[in-house]
Regions:
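Domain-level recognition of soluble alpha/beta enzyme cores
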Residues: 1-58, 69, 79, 165, ...
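Short substrate-entry loop that stabilizes the transition state in hydrolases
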Residues: 30-31, 46-54, 59-96, 206-210
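Cap/lid segment of the alpha/beta-hydrolase catalytic domain
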Residues: 35-38, 64, 68-71, 88-108, ...
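Alpha/beta-hydrolase active-site loop
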Residues: 102-132
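Gly/Ala-rich beta-loop-alpha elbow adjacent to hydrolase catalytic centers
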Residues: 139-143, 147
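Acidic catalytic loop of the alpha/beta-hydrolase fold
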Residues: 182, 204-208, 236-237
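Short alpha-helix in the alpha/beta-hydrolase fold that links the catalytic acid
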Residues: 189, 195, 209-219, 243
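Short beta-strand/loop motif that positions the catalytic acidic residue
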Residues: 193, 199-201
Length: 285
């Protein structure tokens, strides 16, 4: 199969302005390629979905980032039989950072992800092929925070107060890529997390260090299935799909990696690793 691609407008349940999302999904149509902004997707715009019922995966981008930066993961998973929805978080994206690094962003982000799942399931084209019994989440950096809150993590504010997020019981597995876990260091922050987790950290990540991630994961309940992989030589931004050549420069950190790290090669293996984990985690109970 190949990947189709559509753009959706997501309605926020709190009455705020709608926000955009990109959806990739399985199709049997040949790949024509689609350009969104400066980025190329190996996906056919508005292609007919393949017949069947496919797991739904929400991908949450990092703080101040973009929902267009995880193309390698989204395209691979869609072609492998997943419906992928990647929302742009209002107030915490590349064009609007008014809520970045705030408790408000921490409160809102899990709701945005849940509304994105709702939108796919309710869509007249995608809903019939989306399997509501197999839902998962992938998140990078602050998106990893989002995914962890979705599966029951209780975040705490910098001032020491619980942030009243809501878990989404539909989400049965989560992949956390260089996740922001300092929100979950208070006692029992992860006491209600029971779904399988795949956590992938960068050895040379100085933004969300493997040490802080390990400290937070130590709070998971005994028996929770968690795998922590530390990628040798990887930095914080190594989890972003390689940027087009004209965007790669030393003064644009998201396009750079620690010396010697092969981001292009990593993004051949990373989507496969994620797919293997999700296939097992979402297998029929």
């Amino acid at each position: 199969m190949n990947s189709g691609i559509r753009q959706l407008e997501i309605r926020d349940s709190e009455g705020a302005a709608p926000f955009p999302a990109v959806v990739q999904y399985p199709t049997t149509e040949s790949s024509a390629g689609t350009t969104l902004g400066p980025y190329h997707f190996d996906a056919t715009r508005d292609a007919a979905p393949a017949a069947g019922r496919f797991p739904v995966c929400v991908i949450s981008h990092g703080g101040g980032g973009s929902h267009l930066l995880y193309r390698s993961i989204g395209t691979h998973l869609a072609a492998s039989g997943y419906v992928i929805v990647s929302p742009e978080h209002p107030g915490d994206n590349r064009n609007d950072r008014s809520r970045s690094n705030t408790d408000r962003a921490a409160l809102d982000r899990p709701r945005h992800a849940a509304r994105a799942i709702d939108a796919v399931l309710a869509d007249p084209v995608l809903g019939p092929v989306a399997d509501a019994s197999r839902v998962c989440a992938v998140g990078h950096s602050m998106g990893g925070y989002t995914a962890l809150a979705l599966v029951g993590g209780q975040p705490w504010s910098r001032s020491g107060q619980p942030i009243p997020t809501r878990a989404d019981p539909r989400v049965r597995a989560a992949v956390l890529l260089a996740p922001s876990t300092d929100w979950f260091l208070a006692p029992r922050s992860l006491a209600d997390v029971s779904v399988p987790l795949l956590v992938i950290a960068g050895e040379r990540d100085h933004v969300t260090s493997p040490e802080t991630i390990r400290q937070a994961l130590a709070g998971l309940p005994t028996g929770t299935s968690v795998t922590l992989d530390v990628v040798p030589g990887a930095g914080h931004y190594s989890f972003l799909t390689p940027f087009p050549a004209h965007m790669r420069r030393p003064d644009f950190p998201p396009s750079t990696d620690p010396d010697g790290f092969d981001r292009a090669g990593f993004h051949v293996e990373l989507p496969r690793r994620i797919e293997a984990f999700l296939t097992q985690a979402l297998a029929p109970r």
